[in-house]
């Protein structure tokens, strides 16, 4: 191990001291700066063979829980030690030492241990040395985001792992879209599989405290994901949570407060200019008194000021861990409150976790883990549609007053948008409460040397209750709704693993039998025209009309898994995996089979590379495998009936039943075949590390829903139809630019190039599937599924500028001398070609600085907010965008982008290149500065102060509030992605944090 590696190890340990829970026993002023012999105090220093201090080494009195870790100078101090006690000193990468204390100071030198230098990586149903891996697995340690005010786990993945793309709705506690190497499915979920400590979570990442995470592994290629078979096609995120440590008591308290605001707004017309425009274009007069009040600011409304606010985020975390050589525990609790930057939007989380691990006998080990959370999210819907309050606010007249004399919220008389945006947010909001409980028990039996049996049994419980209320003070009628979703998933995994070595051969063989069952129950009730609004959504008994519904789903999965990993001389690695899944979701073809194979060659361990000192750790990897998706409802292959009303005779209405879905018993799995070719190597004595992967995925038997004409019975059915491909390159570069005792600088760059393409639909190259309308009655469908194009492709008109009258013009694609549906064409796509993340960590003495950049290039956004703000026709009926009036054709002539408002007959198309904007951006996602006061300074604990800023600046040409913002209708699919119709803006947040390690 060279000096650089040792220094890096020291810095790693320093970050653990500063960023993780650490307990150190009370400091004594009389002992500072020197080592004094004392009858019950054992002191000493731990160094490596070169005399460099080792920071963070574990020092323990053998057979007790009396322990500590070394400080910044490699020093330690233990109380209540008797002469003759055995002191055990250990540190990752070094051989442990046991020394009998004779009463004097200890000067301990640890020797390198080559056998443990390799990082251990958690993979499906096991763990493996990183050097032995043949597949593509990305590892994200909690140190990568330790000083960043992350409120949800998905934020930690954004930009930090190549091949992973994250889009956040921005709503506190709202939806997050995560894609691993692109979208594989057209109409079903593209979300990855989440596995926490070996248990699959249908509840996703809800209820997980980021502080509890030890590491995350992202399985990307088929060699890694095939072990999850029918649920691995979209990639797998493995999360390993924290546990207690033997001999080290750790108490941690962390508190942070953040202030958020909207840092970019639209330039809209003030009340005075709006009134002038109305008079000029519509001939609407205002009195002199009104115009005077608009001009001096005593009247009028700035709707952005009304709906946006300063949001406050509070986050408090407490953790305690301890343990002996045989039993360890970890307990944590978290309270988080996040006020959104839109009024009435808020998210709260109450969470607790406990973990107990014990070696009961020499051959039996048990681990028990529970995680419980209660979440409350308040606020309305910010999805695409004419009810989005942000979109409404940006189109509402600034000349109106907020409230009517009768106490109702006023509506805008100059457009046809029915509801007041402030009224919607205050009186038509809702509340969603979620209770998530996850628990597991592991039993590991060490049958004989190298042979272990582990049974992991877990539960994933979710109960979500949503309440909604609408007031007649805002709309035309009052209403309420209550909905409850209950889901319980049980999983039992039984794992037999053999690990053995002989001569230069190393073999690990795993066999797994697993059963999973899940049931979901739903119940809902709505009421309209309430007699009184006094009790909000607890009001169904006073509704003049009521409707109720309920539902039930159940499914089960039975699986068998085998995996063999072979290593010869640490040069040649071969991994083979096979999984068989039997799913109750399919009527006939219940069983699917998912094999994979991977090979790796570590060239740097070959004899002919011994004299090559310029390059280290060269490894070539290749893998191929098949994974699948069973992402359909449990009864999708069956013919389902539903009630419907019909007339019979002249004055009689009857209720009957008809086929809601047509049976498709031959429906089977989506299958994704993936090839991966990777190269890893290091330069300059491992100061510069590279990893690059080329991948190609092709999904066949895509699950699509097709419709049949009404004259032959109507309705829809599921089919296996279509093929989708994803190809690209993942790149990761880590540079340890500076590593010495005082200053360290590490820089990591992750990048992914991705090309998504629909290869085939059953109708041939001219077949296509329309997307959905983002706002029915105002905008037609904006996207299309078409062979040769990406999922999420925009289908619209090519804008060619303004004519001599100031009218918008478009390309006449079909040449019929008019602009109609035949002139639509592919005009862009929602998903980026290239994404990157760039992280820089700098440390100087007790100071730490972190800068994290996130970028996306090649994506388009359909800015329907700007379209309606610039339109004097349709639902908005009049402009609110300042440039649309002040820089229109009638004001500045031929250089204008916006048409003349005084010239009628304009053809303003919403889905066109005029409103389809370049969404490229480079953003300083986070900058944080921390200072650590060591315990010898404070006298009671290590104290770390952190100041950070999220979204400090964004470089972009996008004209909306946020180039990364989209209004999700469904975050699991990608067909209608990239539409901004009032996307919740990502705020700029300043956070101050305090962390104490006792």
Residue ranges and their predicted role:
Residues 284-298, 313-315, 384-422:
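Acidic, glycine-rich flexible loop segments
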Residues 829-862:
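Glycine-rich, aromatic-lined ligand/substrate-binding cores of catalytic
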Residues 252-298, 719, 736-830, 893, ...:
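Conserved small-residue
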Residues 1-353, 360-361, 365-373, 411, ...:
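Short, small/polar-rich motifs associated with maturation and membrane association
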């Amino acid at each position: 191990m060279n000096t650089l590696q040792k220094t890096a190890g020291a810095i790693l340990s320093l970050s653990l001291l500063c960023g993780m829970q650490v307990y150190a026993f009370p400091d004594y002023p009389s002992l500072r700066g020197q080592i004094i012999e004392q009858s019950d105090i054992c002191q000493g220093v731990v160094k490596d063979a070169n005399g460099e201090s080792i920071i963070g080494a574990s020092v323990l009195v053998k057979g007790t829980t009396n322990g500590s870790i070394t400080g910044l100078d490699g020093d330690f101090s233990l109380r209540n030690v008797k002469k003759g006690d055995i002191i055990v000193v250990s540190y990752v990468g070094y051989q442990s030492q046991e020394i009998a204390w004779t009463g004097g100071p200890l000067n301990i030198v640890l020797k390198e241990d080559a056998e443990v230098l390799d990082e251990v990586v958690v993979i499906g149903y096991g763990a493996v040395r990183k050097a032995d891996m043949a597949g593509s697995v990305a590892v994200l340690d909690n140190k990568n985001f330790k000083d960043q005010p992350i409120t949800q786990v998905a934020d930690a993945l954004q930009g930090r792992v190549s091949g992973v793309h994250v889009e956040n709705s921005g709503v506190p506690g709202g939806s997050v879209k995560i894609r691993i190497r692109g979208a594989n499915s057209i109409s079903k979920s593209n979300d990855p599989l989440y596995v926490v400590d070996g248990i699959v979570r249908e509840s996703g990442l809800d209820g997980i405290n980021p502080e509890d995470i030890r590491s995350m592994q992202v399985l990307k290629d088929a060699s890694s994901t095939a072990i999850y078979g029918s649920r691995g096609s979209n990639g797998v995120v493995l999360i390993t949570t924290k546990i207690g440590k033997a001999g080290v008591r750790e108490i941690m308290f962390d508190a942070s407060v953040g202030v958020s605001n909207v840092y970019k707004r639209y330039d809209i017309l003030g009340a005075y200019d709006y009134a002038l425009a109305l008079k000029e274009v519509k001939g609407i007069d205002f009195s002199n008194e009104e115009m005077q009040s608009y001009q001096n600011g005593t009247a009028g409304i700035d709707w952005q000021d009304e709906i946006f606010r300063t949001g406050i985020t509070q986050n408090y975390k407490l953790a305690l861990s301890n343990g002996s050589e045989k039993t360890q525990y970890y307990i944590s609790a978290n309270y988080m409150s996040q006020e959104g930057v839109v009024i009435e939007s808020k998210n709260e989380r109450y969470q607790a976790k406990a973990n107990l691990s014990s070696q009961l006998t020499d051959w039996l080990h048990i681990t028990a883990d529970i995680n419980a959370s209660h979440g409350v999210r308040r606020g309305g819907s910010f999805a695409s549609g004419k009810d989005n309050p942000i979109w409404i606010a940006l189109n509402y007249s600034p000349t109106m007053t907020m409230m009517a004399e009768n106490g109702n919220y006023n509506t805008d008389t100059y457009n046809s948008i029915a509801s007041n945006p402030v009224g919607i947010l205050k009186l038509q909001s809702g509340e969603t409460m979620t209770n998530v409980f996850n628990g597991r028990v592991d039993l590991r039996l060490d049958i004989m040397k190298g042979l272990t049996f582990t049974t992991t049994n877990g539960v994933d419980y979710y109960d979500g209750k949503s309440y909604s209320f609408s007031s007649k003070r805002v709309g035309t009628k009052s209403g309420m709704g209550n909905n409850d979703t209950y889901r319980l998933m049980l999983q039992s995994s039984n794992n037999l693993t053999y690990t053995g070595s002989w001569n230069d051969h190393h073999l690990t063989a795993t066999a797994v039998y697993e059963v999973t069952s899940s049931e979901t129950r739903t119940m809902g009730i709505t009421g309209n025209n309430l007699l009184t609004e006094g009790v909000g959504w607890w009001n169904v008994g006073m509704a003049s009309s009521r409707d109720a519904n309920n539902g039930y789903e159940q499914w089960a999965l039975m699986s068998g898994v085998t995996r063999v990993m072979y290593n010869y001389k640490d040069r040649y690695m071969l991994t083979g995996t096979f999984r068989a899944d039997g799913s109750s979701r399919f009527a006939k073809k219940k069983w699917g089979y998912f094999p994979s194979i991977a090979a790796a060659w570590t060239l740097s361990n070959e004899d002919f590379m011994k004299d090559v000192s310029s390059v280290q750790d060269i490894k070539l990897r290749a893998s191929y495998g098949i994974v699948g998706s069973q992402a359909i409802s449990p009864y999708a292959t069956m013919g389902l009936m539903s009630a419907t009303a019909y007339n019979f005779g002249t004055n009689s209405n009857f209720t009957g039943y008809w086929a809601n879905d047509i049976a498709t018993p031959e429906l089977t799995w989506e299958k994704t075949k993936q090839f991966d070719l990777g190269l890893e190597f290091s330069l300059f004595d491992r100061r510069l590390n590279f990893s690059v992967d080329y991948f190609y995925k092709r999904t066949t038997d895509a699950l699509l829903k097709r419709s049949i004409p009404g004259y032959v019975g109507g309705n829809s059915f599921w089919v296996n139809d279509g093929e989708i491909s994803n190809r690209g390159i993942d790149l990761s570069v880590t540079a340890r630019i500076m590593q010495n005792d005082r200053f360290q600088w590490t820089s990591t760059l992750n990048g992914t190039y991705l090309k998504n393409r629909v290869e085939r639909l059953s109708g041939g190259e001219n077949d296509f599937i329309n997307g959905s309308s983002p706002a029915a009655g105002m905008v037609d469908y904006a996207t299309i599924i078409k062979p040769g194009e990406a999922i999420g492709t925009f289908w619209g008109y090519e804008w060619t500028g303004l004519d001599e009258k100031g009218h918008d013009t478009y390309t006449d694609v079909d040449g019929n001398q008019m602009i109609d549906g035949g002139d639509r064409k592919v005009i862009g796509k929602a998903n980026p070609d290239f994404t990157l993340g760039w992280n820089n960590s700098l440390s100087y003495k007790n100071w730490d600085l972190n800068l994290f950049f996130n970028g996306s290039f090649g994506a388009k956004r359909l800015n329907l907010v700007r379209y309606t703000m610039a339109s004097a026709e349709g639902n908005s009926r009049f402009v609110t965008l300042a440039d649309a009036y002040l820089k229109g054709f009638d004001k500045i002539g031929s250089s204008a982008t916006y048409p003349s408002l005084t010239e009628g007959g304009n053809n303003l198309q919403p889905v066109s290149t005029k409103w389809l904007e370049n969404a490229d951006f480079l953003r300083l996602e986070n900058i944080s500065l921390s200072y650590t006061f060591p315990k010898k300074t404070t006298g009671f604990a290590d104290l770390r102060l952190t100041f950070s800023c999220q979204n400090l600046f964004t470089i972009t040409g996008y004209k909306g509030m946020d180039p990364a913002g989209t209004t999700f209708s469904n975050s699991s699919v990608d067909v209608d992605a990239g539409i901004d119709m009032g996307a919740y803006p990502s705020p700029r947040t300043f956070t101050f944090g305090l962390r104490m390690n006792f």
